[in-house]
Amino acid sequence: MLIAVSSADRLDLWQAIVLGFVQGATEFLPISSTAHLKVVPVVLGWGDPGVAFTAVIQLGSIVAVLSYFRQDLTYVLRGLVSAVRRQDFRSEPAQMGLGILFGTIPILIGGLLIKRFIPDYDNSPLRSLAAIAIVSIVMGLLLGIAEQLSKHQRDLSQLRLADGLWMGFAQALALIPGVSRSGSTLTAGLFQGLKRDTAARFSFLLGIPAITIAGLVELKDLLEAGIDGSSLGVLAIGTLSSLIFSWLAIAWLLRFLRTHNTWSFVVYRIIFGGVILTAIATGTLQNI
C-alpha cells in the first residue's frame, strides 16, 4: 500500500504512521515540524516526503487544536459577534479575534506569492538539510534572546491586536523550512512581554486558519492530480496519527510552560542544527 508524495518518493503505511507521529509531536513544539519531517525520513532512508504530504497531514493537527481549544474559540467568536453588533472592539475576545484574523494575513500573502512565483518551491535550496540546520540554530538563538529579555507578565486578558499582528508577521517566517511556526510566534510573543503559556496558547489559535487553508489547498491539488483509494487511505492514517500526537503535544506543552522556561527548546534546536551540519560535513548525511 503506497502513496505518491512527490515525483520520486513513495510512502508505505508504516512510514505514514511514523511521519504522522513526527508531525503531531513537533507541530506545536517550537522545534519545527517541517524540519523534522524532512530530516527524519531522510535519515531513515525514505527520502523527502515533500510539501504536499506535509501540508495535508497537518489537517490532523488542526482537528486536534480545534478540539482542544473549542471553548476558547467559542469565546472568541461570540466576542467578535458581540463587538460587531456594538461596534466596540475593545473587549478581550474581540482583540483576540482581530489578532487572529489580521495576524493570518501575512502568511496568506506570503504563501500565495510563493505558489505564484516559485512553483517548484518543493525543490527549493531552502529545503536542503544544511539550510534547515542553519535556520534551526538561528531560530533557537532568537528564542533564547526572547526568553532572556521578556518580562513574562502579560496574560490573555491583556492581549491586543498589535500582539496578533506582530506574531502574525513572525508566523509568515515559517514559510521558510526549519523556522517553526510555533517557534517563531512564541518568540514574537515573548518579545512582546507575554507569559510563556499565554504566547503558546495564542500561537496555537493563530495557526488554525493558516494551517487549515494550506492543508486544504494541498489536498485539493492532490485530488485533482489523481490519487487512488489506497493512497488516500494511507494519507488518512498519517493524518489520524498526526491528530492523536498533536493533541498530546498541545496538552503537554501548555502544562510545561506554566512552570518551565524555554531554554530546553533553545538547546535542542542548536544541537539539532549542529548535528545535521556535522553529519553533512563528514559525509554521513547527504545535503538533499
UniProtKB/Swiss-Prot annotation:
This is Undecaprenyl-diphosphatase. GO terms for molecular function: undecaprenyl-diphosphatase activity. It catalyses: di-trans,octa-cis-undecaprenyl diphosphate + H2O = di-trans,octa-cis-undecaprenyl phosphate + phosphate + H(+). Catalyzes the dephosphorylation of undecaprenyl diphosphate (UPP). Confers resistance to bacitracin. The gene is uppP. Keywords: Antibiotic resistance, Cell inner membrane, Cell membrane, Cell shape, Cell wall biogenesis/degradation, Hydrolase, Membrane, Peptidoglycan synthesis, Transmembrane, Transmembrane helix. InterPro entries: UppP. PANTHER family: UNDECAPRENYL-DIPHOSPHATASE. GO terms for cellular component: plasma membrane. It holds the Pfam family BacA. The chain crosses the membrane at residues 11-31, 49-69, 94-114, 129-149, 159-179, 199-219, 234-254, 265-285.
